[in-house]
Amino acid sequence: GQLGYDCVKEFRARGHEVHGVSSELFPLSDENVMRAVIEATEPDAILHAAAYTAVDQAEDEPALCQMVNAAGTEILARLAKEFGAKFLYISTDYVFPGTGDAPHETNALTAPHNVYGASKLMGEEAVMAHLSQYFIVRISWVFGIHGKNFVKTMLTLAQEHKSLSVVGDQV
């Protein structure tokens, strides 16, 4: 994915040995495949950036969204514990209710207002339930050279339209 690709590239540029695995080759629904990859690579750390991210579509595919973001994350967290790997889980600001006008504190009340946010919160809870040492990073507005993202969309729309309407309430 977009974030994983950029992280692998940056870590390698800094001299780290990194084994990037795409979600096509590493389906989060298949514990046997995940176990085989982890056994083969023997990671010191796992950066879990894979996710079902189609926020609107998740409302129509809640089972698939939860399988990837919650159940898949739980499997990966259990494997990280079993193999003694440090764990970094990329989550989202969608775990919050979508109100307020300031950045959220780490322990702020979570109250997802959609299937996607609820599934990512279940992923966070799985990480906390299975691991004693972990990082959970809640991000939004991912952008980069690869993949679809807000910046690319805005650049394309700006070329196609005379004016644009864009949300202005994101902190």
Locate the predicted segments by residue.
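Catalytic helix-loop patch of NAD(P)-dependent Rossmann-fold dehydrogenases
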Residues: D60, M67, G72-I75, V95-V137, ...
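N-terminal Rossmann/SDR dinucleotide-binding element
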Residues: G1-A45, E82, G123
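Structural signature of beta-strand start/N-cap positions in the alpha/beta core
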Residues: E17, E42-D44, K86, Q133-F135, ...
